[in-house]
Amino acid sequence: LSKKQVISNGADKLNELKMSGVDVVIMLCTGTFPEWQDFKGVLFPSNTLSSMVKGCLPTGKICVFSPLQRQCAASQLRWEENGYDVVSLSLLPNATKEEAVLAGQAAGRHDLDLIILDCISYTNETKKIIRETAGVPVILGLSSAIRTALEMVE
């Protein structure tokens, strides 16, 4: 689905979920959805990820991975606006092990404090490979939302 399609039908779906008793909904995209910021109980991974990163590293040098090269400039700007020195690289979420190793090596050349996998589709396996290759902590976008959701429902 395109973001446009999601936005056009999403408000109705969110209301349906609320009416059916759902307390917490995770938006499965690390993009921004300003149209829905007022929905109570909707977790936006872009927000949870940003907050988690800020809590772990108030300032410093980070590498942000985005799926497509054309997304890197916007991603870099977003994280720079949060006060970070940013290296922005692309890596497809379905990258092979070899591609993930190369990405980790590329990131590792930048004397980083933290790496962010800024797409819901990145996996724990990719996170592990990049962490081992680059030698710095890695935060997975989906993990930030799931950990927050658990706090809200437990």
Feature names for model-found ranges:
Residues 1-154:
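Non-catalytic structural scaffold of enzyme domains
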